[in-house]
Amino acid sequence: NNHMNFASLVRGGDADNIATISNGNLTTTRSASKHAGPVTGTAIGPGGKWYCEAKVINTGGVQPGITATTSDWLWDTIENTLGFYDDNWSIIASNGNKRNDDSGSGVSYGSAVSADDVVQIAVDLDNGKIWWGLNGTFFASGAPADGTNAAFTNVLTTVPYFFASSMESGGSIEWDFGQLGFAHTPPTGFKAINTNNIAEP
């Protein structure tokens, strides 16, 4: 039973626009000064309710979220950050704003993230919803188990997704898809991301 990790650097539109992967393919880091250094993991969906955590080691430009596996963002040579396109969703760690189809600084949603904070991500690909939380509390009174107060309700349910993050210089995240032992209990009905759970109908 293998858990998801970041086994490859999928972002290929710009040879300079990459990040490094370490710590058993769970820590993603952007060390160069170029804007954005996203990396992506194995796909989830279509369908299912999924949960993971992203411990922010350094907040440098970090924007964790999801992207459709077919998104132009994966091959974008302009270095647009996650949440720029209509088929990717993210939050901005520096201010907690949420982004989707947004070329600006996002929409007010949560609170700023500091180093060593744990960002929670719950994705409902059955009903097209996504939530983010911080250190055990979902933003904006979100309740994934009840399906209420989602950050977005327009997540496409017919395509698979990668978990991903934009990063600027120094940005770093330690991801946990269940193999490290979650810092917080997943919402009822939401699963860790491993081969057994992905294989379930």
State each model region's role.
Residues 1-201:
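PRY/SPRY (B30.2) beta-sandwich protein-interaction domains
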